[in-house]
Regions:
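Sec/Tat signal peptide C-region and signal peptidase I cleavage site
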Residues: 29-34
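Hinge/cleft segment of the Venus flytrap/periplasmic-binding protein
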Residues: 36-86, 333-396
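N-terminal secretory signal peptides that target proteins for export/translocation
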Residues: 1-13
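Hydrophobic alpha-helical
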Residues: 147-163, 232, 251-315
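An alpha-beta-alpha
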Residues: 88, 92-93, 107-109, 195-249, ...
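Extracytoplasmic "Venus flytrap"
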Residues: 38-77, 85-106, 110, 114, ...
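Flexible loop/hinge segments that line or gate small-molecule binding clefts
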Residues: 48-51, 152, 156-195, 213, ...
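Hinge/beta->alpha junction and helix N-cap segments in small-molecule ligand-binding domains
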Residues: 67, 91-104, 120-129, 172-173, ...
């Protein structure tokens, strides 16, 4: 047989082999998509606010939630990840916002462990940009979409995705953890907001020995902020020796311009010795600047917050006005989101797991990921999830 004929036959065989491989990959994706459930399961019960808290209760809560989180309290079994290569879309509302970036990195790490890829779409910090990013993600036909964007603002593309059997996994996409049938979220990953507020209240009650005079700052345009405000202020209001002085409604967009006169007004009304709580540490850079300008004492005015951006870690570490904050996990949330995708692909409900709340104070600010200004539990969560997904039993 001529050499050219041999080459032609060899090339034809390679082509048939390549086409067969593509067909097999396509079949694997089709099977996975056919089994995938995008429709959410029923919502979990709403978190319960602890309305009363003695000083002893508060001190016990603070002691427990400032400990290292070495114990894995998450799932130990669950569905294995399907074989094959899949692409997940990560729709970030704003890649200049640190939590969105860190959650995305967690998604990428979890996906990489399975040989999957992640395509990130950036909303550029606007509602219209995030909607466009979501539509682009949907057009890419991913196996699933993970997003920390407000699900209320994305209802059309979410409904379109669910209709196409593409599950939507939220990270902070709505107020409460678990599935959200109302919003079309197969799962929403977020810390227990009642425990976040309760932990702030516990710190204030414990450290004041039940004598705190407290002001709470909130942006009432957000439902989750209102819920966290209630979970923070209720135990303080019910503490017999404490007093809720005022709840200040401060729109986040106006905080820079309005904070200085607001703080001056609070000091005129309540003097120079009080606590302040909030579910949004973003206020506190402006609050601290206004307090310094007024000559306030760090010994008399103390700030307790939540979310714990790098500025909060820095203030707590250096001994600024902020003395404590409740952070939310960074990369763990990304792994939880990938685990929810694995559950959706198997057609089963997401794992009933909420990472326990952690409280950072000066004594532990550099633990549990704190050296990098983020909360990364030391419970080897990545190892535990990978054992479940791969069906292995590696020591963690």
């Amino acid at each position: 047989m001529p050499k050219s004929s041999l080459n032609s036959n060899y090339k034809a065989s390679l082509a048939r082999f390549a086409l067969a491989g593509v067909a097999l990959l396509g079949t694997a994706f089709t099977v996975a998509r056919a089994e995938t459930r995008a429709e959410p399961y029923p919502a979990w019960p709403e978190p319960v606010i602890q309305e009363k808290m003695s000083v002893e209760d508060a001190k016990a809560i603070v002691a427990e939630r400032t400990k290292p989180q070495t114990e894995w309290k998450g799932p130990t079994d669950g569905p294995k990840a399907p074989s094959g290569s899949f692409t997940i879309a990560y729709v970030s509302p704003d890649q200049s916002y640190t939590p969105h970036v860190l959650w995305g990195k967690g998604v990428e790490a979890g996906a990489k462990a399975l040989g999957w890829t992640v395509q990130t779409f950036n909303g550029q910090g606007t509602v219209s940009g995030t909607l466009s990013a979501m539509q682009q993600a949907l057009a890419s036909n991913p196996a699933a979409i993970i997003t920390p964007a407000d699900a209320n603002a994305l209802q059309k593309p979410i409904k379109d995705a669910v209709a196409r059997h593409i599950p939507i996994i939220g990270i902070h996409a709505t107020a409460f953890p678990g599935p959200s049938p109302e919003l079309g979220l197969y799962h929403n990953i977020v810390s227990n907001p009642a425990e976040i507020g309760g932990t702030e209240a516990a710190y204030v009650i414990a450290r004041s020995d039940g004598k705190a005079q407290n002001i709470h700052m909130v942006d009432n345009s957000y439902a989750i902020a209102r819920f966290k405000a209630k979970s923070t202020t209720t135990p303080i209001a019910n503490c017999s020796g404490c007093k809720m002085l005022e709840t200040v409604n401060m729109p986040l967009g106006d905080a820079s311009a309005r904070m200085s006169p607001a703080i001056s007004g609070l000091m005129a009304r309540y003097g120079d010795s009080w606590w302040m709580t909030t579910c949004c540490d973003g206020y506190y850079t402006n609050v601290a600047a206004a307090l310094r300008a007024s000559g306030a004492s760090m010994e008399k005015i103390k700030l307790v917050g939540a979310d714990a951006p790098p500025s909060a870690y820095d203030m707590i570490r250096k001994g600024g006005f902020e003395v404590a904050s409740v952070p939310e996990p960074s990369s763990l949330f990304g792994y939880q989101a990938v685990d929810a995708v694995v559950h959706a692909m198997a057609g089963v409900e997401p794992a009933h797991f909420i990472q326990p709340v952690f409280l950072i104070v000066k004594d532990n600010v550099d633990t549990e990921g704190g050296k990098n200004n983020e909360f990364v539990p030391s419970n080897n969560f990545a190892c535990h999830y990978e054992n479940i997904w791969k069906g292995t039993k590696n020591p963690c």
